[in-house]
Regions:
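Bacterial Sec-dependent N-terminal signal peptides
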Residues: 1-22
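Terminal presequence/propeptide segments associated with secretion/organelle targeting
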Residues: 17-297
């Protein structure tokens, strides 16, 4: 099935050559899934599950952002530094480039807060909480007589639930998404920060090494990262760009470790995937094999 960039997912696996176990889960379901908790601990997870995601207390998920609505990012400092991929920051880097200052070719570094470059159309989105609204959505469609009527009813109530969030608090955004082929519906509540400034980008020869040819063909050796900073008003709240804004102070930070990892280390990723076929039905897999893969090969 397809996921929009609106819900944080967790992927866990063990890097050991001898054994690997993996999966993809909605964060809201993690606490309920005792087997997932047990398996991750067996693989080496030391952090309690409620430290991964907790809508009532600061947690690791608070450091993970939807970057621009099309990528993932992670907050790594108390002053709002965000790491994301080079290709995710590519358009912002390009926007500030010129013949005199070709930041795509040569890279960019801001040596002070004053040198950081604003990006008017860029934002980062923090997930505040998720809520299962399946019963409410499906009840709105129970009297539908056709699939078309059902779709209209479902879409309508999804939009209503989302709008209710911003009506209660204008700084919040509510989005309802369908999961598991429309058998579950989850509301995600976000807060957006619209003042995001470019801090550092490597040259494209590093950040885009191999370009998309290598991306889809080979293991990559790419410095695929860029660094931005979130700015807020003096109350640490969302604000449009202003010279008076100050660096955002996050509720939770994922600090960078210089110790690295070793073979067999537990590995887990939180983020906003563009799409996944992990929960595709057997009929969907059959369709891909017959009509998609056969035509390609």
């Amino acid at each position: 099935m397809k996921f929009r960039l609106t819900a944080v997912i967790v992927l866990a696996l063990c890097l050991s050559n001898a054994f690997a176990d993996e999966g993809m889960w909605l964060l809201g379901n993690l606490k309920k899934n005792k087997q997932t908790d047990r398996v991750m601990r067996e693989l080496g997870l030391q952090m309690p599950v409620n430290k991964l995601y907790n809508p009532k207390k600061p947690c690791l998920a608070d450091a993970v952002v939807s970057f621009g609505g099309f990528c993932s990012g992670v907050v790594v400092s108390e002053d709002g530094l965000v790491f994301t991929n080079h290709h995710c920051g590519f358009s912002s880097i390009q926007q500030h480039s010129s013949v005199e200052h070709d930041y795509l070719k040569d890279g960019f570094v801001a040596r002070s807060l004053e040198e950081e470059l604003p990006n008017p159309e860029l934002y980062v989105r923090f997930l505040l909480r998720t809520e299962n609204v399946t019963k409410r959505v499906l009840s709105a469609a129970k009297h539908a007589k056709t699939e078309s009527e059902r779709r209209v009813a479902v879409d309508s109530v999804m939009n209503v639930i989302g709008m209710e969030v911003s009506e209660k608090d204008s700084t919040l955004t509510g989005i309802v998404d369908a999961y598991y082929a429309g058998n579950e519906f989850w509301l995600s509540v976000y807060r957006d920060y619209n003042d995001v400034r470019l801090v550092f980008a490597p040259p494209s020869s590093v950040g885009k090494f191999g370009w998309d040819t290598d991306n889809w063909m080979w293991p990559r050796h790419t410095g695929d990262f860029s660094v931005f900073r979130i700015y807020a008003n003096t109350q640490n709240g969302p604000a449009d760009y202003s010279p008076d804004n100050v660096p955002y102070h996050p509720e939770y930070v994922a600090p960078v470790s210089l110790e690295g990892y070793k073979e067999g280390s537990f590995c887990m990723t939180l983020g906003y995937p563009g799409s996944t076929e992990r929960y595709l039905s057997s009929y969907g897999i059959e369709e891909m094999m017959i009509y998609s893969y056969n035509n390609r090969f």
